[in-house]
Amino acid sequence: HELLISSGVGARLESAAIPFYPGAQEAAAQGLIPGGAYRNLDYYQNAVQWQGDSALKDDTLILLADPQTSGGLLIAVPPARLEALLASLAQSGVAGRAIGTIEEAPAGTMIIA
């Protein structure tokens, strides 16, 4: 969110491309959510626009806001360099994937599809 604000752009995130820990979605469906996730979601609610499957909205958003999963590394790279970056990461034994794109949108906006 801070990267988007400082760059004056928004992002479109593809929820199906975002990896979750094994069992995380099942735990969320059972209501096993840390309190910090609700506080994070409340803090970012005005920056998030949901455009995905409405049946998946609540569980997906709360998982994206889970403070236990906030340690992942996010890299912004020009589209022309994406494949080279992913290949380099794979060669180094690091799992990488594209989860979204930067878009012209109000600064800090996160569109989740």
Language-model segments: residues:
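Glycine-/charge-enriched secondary-structure boundary and capping motifs
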Residues: 1-113
